[in-house]
């Protein structure tokens, strides 16, 4: 379930997030920023990630920015962060590595952290926590690796070892397969002493695999031992190692290089220090941009180079699964960024241009399933008090299926399919983004909580430097470790963002946001408080009990109770603040609402209104959402929109709320309170609030006079009607009545119930059981009948009787007598057998609890509780495998509350089922108790239902197995300790004891002594950790078992099959079954499903993942693919129907029947259904009997159903002859079914509507079915004629059965009448294709020919042949249609043809018979009719019938036969050519030539049918048949040349040409390059005069493609140069060589193609070819010709070549660069990058000139000319400084000339600068002294001097008109008109237009006086600008 979308908000818009790190143990997020600093982020009230100091965590996380600043000579400099690692469980502890080789262990409370600087000399590139946070490793870019031992108590560390190899460190992984064996095995032997994990760190029990980029791989042990694995031989070129993956379940490691080299290795044994085992070396082709991701089961996933295919490679078997994304995703363009994976959820693929991603999930075809499909789940009765579901160590299997001997794995290929698509919400007002990049996946512990971090590309074009991550390049210069979207220099806009998208965003948005990162949390954690479900069943039972009528009365169960059960309200948390509420009524009216809460949600509670009438579909209720001490209540009702009923908040400073439930219109809250902020939360109370927040009452527990302050905080509560059950942190169970709400009573101590071993039962020792072990197959047979005498019991029955709980007291006494006292404790069965000491007892607390009233008694409550604990190794909470179920009498509790007593639990040694008595002592409120142990499964939730069943949600993962097994997966599988889903009878302790006895029984040899010497250090280490001497003695055995457990390839493959997590919904039917054995039924579900409730006979759950035809799509803002799903328990009803359709009466009866029958108590089982007259009960029971093969009970059910059809079927089938195989002496449930019983079950299942099961039984028995159908056909039709048609309609498939029996009878009669054609039609009607949808009988696998062979048709044919000869036989055969009949006739005729000798004399009596050729022909035709094509072709060749041979060759669909026929025609054609050459063409008839042409055409077609294209081409070339050659060649190359008017645009051809895939090799298989070359040249040599224009053009196109396939590029290019075909983009792509690298000829061809495209005006295509040929100069020229400036800029940035930079700058200067700052920046930047300093100076000089000539802006001109002078000086210095004393005289002379030229240009720039400066000084003087009396003369004099200087200088930038205009303006201010007129005249005399240099008003006022005409420009109508008017409308 995708829960939350979190945005990262940074205050500084120039910063962007480069990488994020999350921590499982906290909600803190650490973000590495682009400036090299670390930000500490935390979700705020709006669920956005902001700096922690701005949230409620400000006190705990006061320092939210970490920057290391050092002082240098240049001042203060920030040192960027280059690596970071969060501790696995210590909250907010991180290790930060810096670029200066230092690192720091830092808490966000430390504002001045200390730095370790002496350990590394180069910048850190990798930091990791290993060994569950006890080992720290730091790596730097020089290849140095340092291991440290870390103390989680003092937060200190000490160095263990260091090593260094060539290249940087790619990764380091822990070899958990061997190290887990040590830790978890020691844990199993530690008894009651808690484990201290710190003892195991740094002593040599852990191994780590390290990989360096240059190819070295080594293993480090945590005590400093270094073991070199090897050096990976990388491909030549620029390949580096960049991925290291490890799989614990198969102990396999894989190193992958950048070029796809795979190095797969493992270890020969499971011991520490084992030798390497190289498994495989091979190479893959993948797309680097998308990366490689690790999958379970030793698999990896990557994108193929074509970008449209996802490949999943199994490394051990080298099998590849493909999925073409374009087949599943509409408008698929490509993959955008790196792949990501979430374990057991799917592969996440970001989609280019779609703003979203797709999920590819795996549907496994492997698994271990028993006969019931229950995945190996069995109930094992250890006692009446303690039951195992998977533990086979001490208990005997009571289930009839028997224990699983081992994991029955069926290997198969997994199927990968696109299951979901999600798209980004495009209306986020705070940011703008284009495409998604997935930069990280952070996986939480045990797969419960997984976070996907997605990095969205920016639209901001600001340059953001990436200062922090160390960047590693391969030898080709490509970065191999950057996050997607980052280039080495900048975080620029990634591909796929077009200009229109960028332009559409406002400047404010672009400037306010940098890179944008979002977190999507995939939460698979236990959701016991995040889902809720409620209906009115409990209130209905209470109301029925008040009436005094029975609870099991049919009227109540099928009406009121059914209505209450089928109407419900459910709620599921789908986001941090979003709840999906579903309201379902009895009429299947489903209404869904999405509620958005303003605060985070911790708990959901639902209460339905019992006063609403569910039958009228007006169900209503309340939904409570609690979180952050805020209570929000919504009222929901069917047909109405939910509305807010109330909301209030408690002050978290004084109140802590642990749990809450709804009670009517009140809220009951379990809270701890305190009076002031200085005190502790001492007050424990249950407070009753109204939904609006007013306090209505309080029940204080800590002030209770009985218990005092011993009551701990109430952790969980559950409410049943008015009964409130509460569990505190000490696992004590309390009760109160909410009506009175004035006192509380303690019911029992659940912790004592679980951990007190005195109440468990002890059993026989293993050796004693082995002495009397009986291996009869009937291990699960029921108990002996009561009437049998004890003396007649067998030994097995005695043992079995000991295991039954009726004799529990007697068992204990016998065991005390038989078993030694010192061994008793070892054989006690309790939760200690599966609870590891990794979980201390004092950390176990309640996970969830639920309760409901049962239908057996309205005062009996079925209560369940599941647990969680603290794992001291991982430092995190974990679920436990136990469920405690209690049956509690609320009536007794009420009496005890009145009397002020405490409830006491009943002793489990009492006989189950005996009712406790109530007396003056208060009696016992706990009637029954039972503990279920599901190890190695862990329990998420346990929900009881009113029928006395429990639904469990179980999770099993490979990591969780270790907690409850004590060994790694491979070791357990090899030694038989356990199989993935079940603990074995030979556990680790038993295995070591067996190994010890085996060694003692044999003399110790030298090998064992050698083993001990080799592992002496490891043995001594382990013995120092152990406590007792007995444990120390087992250490050598343990080490020996690990060292001798060799691992083969098959072992690794077997282990990888089990490498996946799964979830099971398990129903326990009969929680307190009186015969020990409960009935289990499992439902496998994906990890993302959540159980809502169990409503027998159906599970109700929220399901997300699943295989579907069309992927589900959703939106990131409200991602909600979850759907409400209902699935049936097959033991209680049909799997085809929804469980709610079954009546509750039937469910109740079948539930009791199932429990009793599974324990062998058939009499009691039958009594539960006998009292019922409900036809639903008997019908469902009949279906159940059919499923289990209960034939005798099925007959009873049919009697109670009172159906004449079923009675008729029963009578007809049972009257048939019974088989001798039936053994009437056995129990009816275990009797082997006779054939007629199988038939009866099949027919009755069809009659009852379960047609699928019936048809399965009928498979392969069509003849037996035919006889029964004949028998019952007439009877059924008789019943229909008698008016029983309505009852027949109710029997489902029998209507079809009657029809088919009639047709079958008719078919049999037609056979005897020799009407073969009609009988065949009848048989086809009976045995037609499946029509399962209509319930008809299908797939009977009957062969009509088998029935036809039984008649006399074949014999009749033989008689005709013998009597009348072959002619009569042939006449008869021509009328036949049956293949078998035709085949026999053809054999007869063929035999007759073989016996004829045409050369011998034919007797007179035979002259009228058929000749041999005719017989061969007729035999061939008959063989062809019966599809015997091989015989037909042989006969046709005998008679040389061309048409028949051609027909057989083309229709047989056999390549072999097509080849034979083609050879025949080819030989015939060659013979014809010889005949023509001998006789001459003029002497050959025209018909002969036409026949020869037909022969060659036949041969060509047949060669093609045979898949031999090469022979066809050879034949066409030799026969000079160009048109056929072109067509054949086009078909082979998939070229549509037959379409005369179509362009060369076939995508298949282009795809095959552009990618060297295997498919191309398949198409051209068998056709050599030489043949393609000859064929292409032959087509090119065709004269255009001999063929039409269309044909000729088709020849040329096909020839070009063929030549390209043959790599004859020069010939193909010559055809283009000769003008035979025009160049196009498609043709250019075809002619482009597949591999250009290191191939000069290929480069020349590619360049030639580019030039041809350039010449043809196809500039974009030419650019592609030039880039491919690495000729960037030609590429930029084509781009310039295309005229797109943005493309020119992008290409220049990409090419990074001097000539390209200069060409781009020159082109941009031809554009309007002044109005587009981007162009100007690019021009300057390109010149700088090209180091073209002279051009930069020239550009600035041109800027200065243009500023003056166009805009008269001398201020900007001055700035530009100054910049030009500075650049010119730099250019001069650069040329002078590069001079060398060794250079030649010619070079020195050229350099001197260059310097002189540059200095001359500089002199011109300086002179222009001086003149511009002088003019500006004149302007300043004129402005400042305009009113001074003597200023006029001064200004005139200076202006004259300046004009003289300007006129003397060539190419002067200063314009004389500007100087004279300045004088005119000056005199105009002073009012001196005469001088103005004089200046205007002077300007005219010098050819200067005064209008361009004077102000318009000044010129207009004085022009006339100067003799100039002033034109009055009247405003014409068409010149009026209307743009201003438009805005008004």
Curated annotation (Swiss-Prot):
GO terms for cellular component: 9+2 motile cilium; axoneme; ciliary basal body; ciliary pocket collar; ciliary tip; intraciliary transport particle A. GO terms for biological process: intraciliary anterograde transport; intraciliary retrograde transport; intraciliary transport involved in cilium assembly. It is found in: Cell projection, Cilium, Flagellum; Cytoplasm, Cytoskeleton, Flagellum axoneme; Cytoplasm, Cytoskeleton, Flagellum basal body. The keyword Manganese does not apply. Keywords: Cell projection, Cilium, Cilium biogenesis/degradation, Cytoplasm, Cytoskeleton, Flagellum, Leucine-rich repeat, Repeat, WD repeat. Residues 774-795 are annotated as: Disordered. WD repeats lie at residues 76-116, 119-158. InterPro entries: TPR_IF140/IFT172/WDR19 (IPR056168), TPR_IF140_C (IPR056156), WD40/YVTN_repeat-like_dom_sf (IPR015943), WD40_repeat_dom_sf (IPR036322). The keyword Nucleotide-binding does not apply. It comes from the Eukaryota. LRR repeats lie at residues 957-980, 1019-1044, 1510-1532. Component of the intraflagellar transport complex A (IFT-A) involved in flagellar assembly. This is Intraflagellar transport protein 140. It comes from Giardia intestinalis (strain ATCC 50803 / WB clone C6).
């Amino acid at each position: 379930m995708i829960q939350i979308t979190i945005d990262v908000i940074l205050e500084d818009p120039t910063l962007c997030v480069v990488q994020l790190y999350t921590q499982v143990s906290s909600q803190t997020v650490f973000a590495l920023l682009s400036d090299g600093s670390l930000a500490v982020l935390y979700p705020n009230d709006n669920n956005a990630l902001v700096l922690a100091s701005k949230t409620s965590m400000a006190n705990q996380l006061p320092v939210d920015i970490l920057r290391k600043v050092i002082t240098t000579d240049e001042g203060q400099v920030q040192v960027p962060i280059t690596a970071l690692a969060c501790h696995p469980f210590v909250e907010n502890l991180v290790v930060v590595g810096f670029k200066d080789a230092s690192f720091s262990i830092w808490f966000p409370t430390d504002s001045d952290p200390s730095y370790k600087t002496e350990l590394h000399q180069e910048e850190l590139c990798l930091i990791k926590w290993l060994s569950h946070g006890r080992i720290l490793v730091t790596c730097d870019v020089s290849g140095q690796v340092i291991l440290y031992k870390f103390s989680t108590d003092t937060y200190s560390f000490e160095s263990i070892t260091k090593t260094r190899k060539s290249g940087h460190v790619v990764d380091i992984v822990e070899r958990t397969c061997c190290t887990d064996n040590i830790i978890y095995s020691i844990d199993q032997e530690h008894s009651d002493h808690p484990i201290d994990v710190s003892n195991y760190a740094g002593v040599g029990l852990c191994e780590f695999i390290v990989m360096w980029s240059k190819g070295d791989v080594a293993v480090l042990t945590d005590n400093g031992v270094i073991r070199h694995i090897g050096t990976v031989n990388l491909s030549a070129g620029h390949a580096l190692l960049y991925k290291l993956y490890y799989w614990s379940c198969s102990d396999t490691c894989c190193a992958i290089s950048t070029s796809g080299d795979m190095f797969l290795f493992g270890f020969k044994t499971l011991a520490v220090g084992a030798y390497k085992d190289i498994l495989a070396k091979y190479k893959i082709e993948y797309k680097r941009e998308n990366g490689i991701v690790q999958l379970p089961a030793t698999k990896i996933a990557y994108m193929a180079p074509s970008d449209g295919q996802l490949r999943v490679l199994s490394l051990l078997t080298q099998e590849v699964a493909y999925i073409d994304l374009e087949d599943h995703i509409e408008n698929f363009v490509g993959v955008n960024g790196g792949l990501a994976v979430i374990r057991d959820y799917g592969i996440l693929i970001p989609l280019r241009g779609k703003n979203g991603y797709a999920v590819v999930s795996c549907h496994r075809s492997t698994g271990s399933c028993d006969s019931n499909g229950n995945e190996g789940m069995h109930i094992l009765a250890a006692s009446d008090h303690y039951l195992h579901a998977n533990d086979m160590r001490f208990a005997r299997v009571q289930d009839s299926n028997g224990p699983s001997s081992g994991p029955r794995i069926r290997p198969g290929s997994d199927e990968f399919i696109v299951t979901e698509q999600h798209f980004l919400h495009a209306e986020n007002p705070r940011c703008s983004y284009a495409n998604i990049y997935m930069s990280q996946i952070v996986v939480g512990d045990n797969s419960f909580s997984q976070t996907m971090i997605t990095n969205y590309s920016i639209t901001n074009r600001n340059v953001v430097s990436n200062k922090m991550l160390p960047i590693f390049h391969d030898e080709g210069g490509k970065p191999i470790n950057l996050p997607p979207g980052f280039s080495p220099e900048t975080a620029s806009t990634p591909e796929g963002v077009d200009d229109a998208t960028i332009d559409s965003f406002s400047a404010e948005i672009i400037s306010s946001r940098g890179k944008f990162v979002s977190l999507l949390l995939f939460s698979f954690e236990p959701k016991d408080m995040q889902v809720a479900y409620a209906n009115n069943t409990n209130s209905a039972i209470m109301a029925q009990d008040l009436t005094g009528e029975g609870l099991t009365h049919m009227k109540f169960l099928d009406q009121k109770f059914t209505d209450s059960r089928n109407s419900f309200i459910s709620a599921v948390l789908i986001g941090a603040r979003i709840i999906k509420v579903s309201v379902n009524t009895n009429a299947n009216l489903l209404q869904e609402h999405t509620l958005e809460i303003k605060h985070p949600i911790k708990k959901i509670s639902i209460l339905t209104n019992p006063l609403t009438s569910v039958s009228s579909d007006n169900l209503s209720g309340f939904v409570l959402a609690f979180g952050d001490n805020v209570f929000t209540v919504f009222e929901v009702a069917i047909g109405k929109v939910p509305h807010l009923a109330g909301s209030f908040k408690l002050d978290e400073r004084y109140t802590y709320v642990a749990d809450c439930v709804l009670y009517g219109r009140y809220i009951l809250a379990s809270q701890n309170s305190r009076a002031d902020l200085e005190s502790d939360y001492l007050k424990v109370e249950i407070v009753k609030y109204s939904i609006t927040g007013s306090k209505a009452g309080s029940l204080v527990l800590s002030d209770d006079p009985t218990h005092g302050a011993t009551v701990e905080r109430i952790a969980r509560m559950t409410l049943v009607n008015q009964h409130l059950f509460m569990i505190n942190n000490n696992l004590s169970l309390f009760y109160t009545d909410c009506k009175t709400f004035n006192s509380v009573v303690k019911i029992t101590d659940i912790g004592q119930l679980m951990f007190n071993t005195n109440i468990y039962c002890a059993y026989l020792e293993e050796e004693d059981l082995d002495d009397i072990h009986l291996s009869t197959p009937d291990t699960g047979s029921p108990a002996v009948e009561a009437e049998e005498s004890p003396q007649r019991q067998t030994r097995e029955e005695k043992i079995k009787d000991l295991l039954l709980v009726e004799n529990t007291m007697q068992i204990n006494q016998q065991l005390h007598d038989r078993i030694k006292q010192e061994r008793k404790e070892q054989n006690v069965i309790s939760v200690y057998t599966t609870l590891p000491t990794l979980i201390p007892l004092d950390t176990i607390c309640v996970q969830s609890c639920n309760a409901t009233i049962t239908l057996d008694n309205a005062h009996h409550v079925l209560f369940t509780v599941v647990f969680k604990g603290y794992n001291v190794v991982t430092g995190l909470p974990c679920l436990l495998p136990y469920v405690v179920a209690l049956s509690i009498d609320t009536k007794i509790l009420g009496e005890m509350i009145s009397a002020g007593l405490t409830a006491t639990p009943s002793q489990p040694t009492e006989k189950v089922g005996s009712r406790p008595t109530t007396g003056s002592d208060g009696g016992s409120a706990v009637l029954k108790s039972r503990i279920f142990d599901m190890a190695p499964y862990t329990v998420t939730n346990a929900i009881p239902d009113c029928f006395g069943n429990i639904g469990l949600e179980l999770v099993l993962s490979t990591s969780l197995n270790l907690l409850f097994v004590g060994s790694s997966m491979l070791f357990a599988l090899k030694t038989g300790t356990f199989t993935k889903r079940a603990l074995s009878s030979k556990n680790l302790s038993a295995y070591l004891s067996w190994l010890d006895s085996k060694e003692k029984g044999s003399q110790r040899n030298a090998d064992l002594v050698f083993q001990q010497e080799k592992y002496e250090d490891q043995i001594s280490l382990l013995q120092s950790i152990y406590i007792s001497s007995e444990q120390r003695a087992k250490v050598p055995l343990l080490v020996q078992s690990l060292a001798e457990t060799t691992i083969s390839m098959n072992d690794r493959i077997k282990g990888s099959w089990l490498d996946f997590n799964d979830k099971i919904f398990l129903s326990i039917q009969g929680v307190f079954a009186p015969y020990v054995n409960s009935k289990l039924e499992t439902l496998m579900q994906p990890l993302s499903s959540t159980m809502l409730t169990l409503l027998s006979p159906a599970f109700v759950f929220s399901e997300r993942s699943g295989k579907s035809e069309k992927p589900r799509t959703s939106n990131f803002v409200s991602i909600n693919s979850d759907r409400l799903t209902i699935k049936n328990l097959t033991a209680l009803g049909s799997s085809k129907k929804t469980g709610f359709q079954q009546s509750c009466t039937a469910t109740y009866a079948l539930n009791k029947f199932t429990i009793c029958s599974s324990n062998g108590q058939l009499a009691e089982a039958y009594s539960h259904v006998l009292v019922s007259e409900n036809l639903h009960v008997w019908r469902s029971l009949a279906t159940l009997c059919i499923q289990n093969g209960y034939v005798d009970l099925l007959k009873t059910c049919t009697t109670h159903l009172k159906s004449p059809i079923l009675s008729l079927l029963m009578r007809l089938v049972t009257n048939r002859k019974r088989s001798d195989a039936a053994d009437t002496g056995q129990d009816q449930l275990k009797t082997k079914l006779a054939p007629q019983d199988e038939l009866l079950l099949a027919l009755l299942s069809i009659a009852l509507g379960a047609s699928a099961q019936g048809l399965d039984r009928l498979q392969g028995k069509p003849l037996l079915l035919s006889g029964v159908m004949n028998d019952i056909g007439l009877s059924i039709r008789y019943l229909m004629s008698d008016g029983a048609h309505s009852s027949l309609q109710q029997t489902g498939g029998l209507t079809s059965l009657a029809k088919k029996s009639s047709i079958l009878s008719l078919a049999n009669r037609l056979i005897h009448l020799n009407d073969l054609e009609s009988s065949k039609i009848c048989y086809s009607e009976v045995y037609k294709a499946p029509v399962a949808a209509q319930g008809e009988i299908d797939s009977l696998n009957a062969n009509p020919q088998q029935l036809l062979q039984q008649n006399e048709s074949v014999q009749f044919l033989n008689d005709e042949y013998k009597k009348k000869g072959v002619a009569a036989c042939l006449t008869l055969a021509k009328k036949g249609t049956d293949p078998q009949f035709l085949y026999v006739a053809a054999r007869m005729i063929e035999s007759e043809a073989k016996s004829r000798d045409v050369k011998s004399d034919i007797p007179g009596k035979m002259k009228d018979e058929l000749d041999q050729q005719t017989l061969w022909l007729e035999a061939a035709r008959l063989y062809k009719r019966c599809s015997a094509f091989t015989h037909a072709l042989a006969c046709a060749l005998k008679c040389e019938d061309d048409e028949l041979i051609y027909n057989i060759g083309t229709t047989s669909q056999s390549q072999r036969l097509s080849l034979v026929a083609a050879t025949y025609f080819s030989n015939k054609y060659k013979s014809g050519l010889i005949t023509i050459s001998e006789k001459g063409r003029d002497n050959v008839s025209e018909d002969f030539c036409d026949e020869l042409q037909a022969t060659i055409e036949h041969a060509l077609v047949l060669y093609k049918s045979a898949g031999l294209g090469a022979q066809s081409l050879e034949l066409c070339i030799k026969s000079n048949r160009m048109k056929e050659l072109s067509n054949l060649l086009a078909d082979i190359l998939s070229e549509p040349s037959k379409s005369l008017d179509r362009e060369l645009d076939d995508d298949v051809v282009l795809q095959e040409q552009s990618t060297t895939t295997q498919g191309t090799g398949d198409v051209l298989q068998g056709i050599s390059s030489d043949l393609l070359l000859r064929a292409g040249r032959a087509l090119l040599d065709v004269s255009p005069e001999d063929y039409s224009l269309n044909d000729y053009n088709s020849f040329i196109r096909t020839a070009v493609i063929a030549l390209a396939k043959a790599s004859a590029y020069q010939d193909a290019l010559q055809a283009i140069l000769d003008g035979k075909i025009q160049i196009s983009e498609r043709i250019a792509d075809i002619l482009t060589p597949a591999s250009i690298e290191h191939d000069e000829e290929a480069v020349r061809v590619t360049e030639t193609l580019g030039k041809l495209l350039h010449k043809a005006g196809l500039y974009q295509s030419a650019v592609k070819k030039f880039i491919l040929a690495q000729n960037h100069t030609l590429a930029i020229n084509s781009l310039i010709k295309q005229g797109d400036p943005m493309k020119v800029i992008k290409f220049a940035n990409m090419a990074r070549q001097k000539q390209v930079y200069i060409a781009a700058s020159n082109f941009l200067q031809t554009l309007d660069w002044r109005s587009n700052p981007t162009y100007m920046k690019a021009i300057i930047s390109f010149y700088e990058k090209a180091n073209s300093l002279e051009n930069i100076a020239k550009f600035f000089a041109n800027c200065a000139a243009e500023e003056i000539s166009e805009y008269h802006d001398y201020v900007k001109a001055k700035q530009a000319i100054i910049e030009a002078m500075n650049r010119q000086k730099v250019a001069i210095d650069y040329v002078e400084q590069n001079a060398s004393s060794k250079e030649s005289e010619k070079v020195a002379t050229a350099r001197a000339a260059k310097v002189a030229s540059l200095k001359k240009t500089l002199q011109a720039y300086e002179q222009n600068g001086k003149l511009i400066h002088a003019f500006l000084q004149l302007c300043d003087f004129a402005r400042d002294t305009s009113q001074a009396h003597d200023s006029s003369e001064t200004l005139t004099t200076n202006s004259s001097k300046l004009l003289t200087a300007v006129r003397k200088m060539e190419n002067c930038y200063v314009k004389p008109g500007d100087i004279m205009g300045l004088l005119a303006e000056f005199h105009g201010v002073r009012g001196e008109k005469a001088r103005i007129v004089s200046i205007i005249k002077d300007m005219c005399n010098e050819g200067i237009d005064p209008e361009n240099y004077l102000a318009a008003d000044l010129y207009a006022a004085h022009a006339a006086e100067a003799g100039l005409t002033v034109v009055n420009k009247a405003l014409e109508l068409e010149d009026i600008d209307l743009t201003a008017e438009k805005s008004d409308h």
